[in-house]
Amino acid sequence: VDIATYGFDRRFENSGKINTQGIELNLGYEVNDNYQTSINLSSYQTILEEYVLENGDIRANLGAPGQNSTNMVLVRPGEVIGQIWAPRFQSAGADGSPVFADINGDGQVVAAQDKWNDADADFEAAGNGVPTLEMGWSNNLSFGNWSVNAFFRGAFGHSLVNTFRAFYEPRIASQSSYNFVNTSLAIPELTAAQFSSLYVEKADFFKLDNLTVAYNFNIAEGSFITGAQLSANVQNAFVITNYTGTDPEPALVDPGSYSGGNFVPGQGDVLAPGIDRRINYFSSRTVTLGLNINF
C-alpha cells in the first residue's frame, strides 16, 4: 500500500480458507465408591481450502547458521495443514554427503531446496506436525485415609523436526568446536548438512502429567486441630516416547527461526506446525510436599 497515505507499506488481510473437522469423545465411569475414572479422546484434521498462492508455498525457515534458505512445511490448497516436506534420506555417500531416494522413479534425484515444487522433484511428506489422536485419562482412588489422583496424557501420530540434530549432528568441519548431538539416529559418516527426512521423528508420547497422593490423619475428638492432611504432588512424573529431542509435545505454532539466541521478529507461523526449535527446553519435573492443618 501507499506508505505516504497509510503510514506503512503493507497491510494484512484474510486471504485463505481452512476447514477443520474432527471428533471428541468423553467417557466417565464410577467403578466403585473408591475408584472413578474418565477418559477424553480427540482427533481432527485441518485442510487448506484456499490460499493466496495457488501453487502453494513451503514455510518455516530452518535458520542460521547456513540453512536460512531451507524451509520445511508445505502449505498448499487442497492439502492437510502440517505436512513436513523433505527429501527421503537413504544413506551417507562416500564423500560424506547425504544420498536421497528417487521417490518418483524417473532415474534422477532432484532434492535441491528451490526445486521442492517442480514436477520431477523428489520431495514427500516426511511427517505431519499435527497429532491424529490426543488423549487425557483421569483416575481418582481412595482407600482408608489415603487418596490418589493420577492424570495421564498422550498425543499420537504427529512428527517433529528435531532442529538440534539438523544443526549439530552432521560432523561438519566448520563446526568442529561444537558439541555434536549424538543420538541413536546419528550417522557419523555424514559430514554435510542438508535437511531431509533424517531429522523428522515420530513424537508419540504417553505421560503421567500429574500425580497427587494424600493422607488424612485421624484427629482425636475434642482436639484443637479439626483436620490434617499430608500430600505429595509430582508434575511431569514420567514420559514414554521414542523422540530424541527436548520435548515430544506437539508444536502447533512455529515461533520462527532465531539468530544469536533471539527469535527473528515477525516469523511466527500458525500454518507451520511440527518444528522443535533449538530455543526449546526440556520439560521440568516438579515435586511438591504439602501439609494442610485445620483448626
Residue ranges and their predicted role:
Residues G274-F295:
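Structural signal for terminal/edge beta-strands and the immediately following C-terminal loop/tail
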Residues T5-E13, T70-N149, I187-A203, K207-N210, ...:
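Outer-membrane beta-barrel transmembrane strand signature
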Residues I18-T20, T132, F206, S284:
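Membrane-spanning beta-strands of outer-membrane beta-barrel proteins
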Residues Y29, N117-D118, A272, F282:
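Short, small/polar-rich motifs associated with maturation and membrane association
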Residues V1-I3, E13-G16, E30-G127, Q235-G245, ...:
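Conserved small-residue
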Residues A60, Q83, A94, A155-A237, ...:
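Extracytoplasmic gating/loop element in the C-terminal half of outer-membrane beta-barrel translocons
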Residues A4-Q21, N26:
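Contiguous, function-dense segments enriched for cysteine-driven chemistry
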Residues I23-V31, Y35-S43, M135-L141, W146-G154, ...:
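Membrane-embedded beta-strands that build the outer-membrane beta-barrel scaffold
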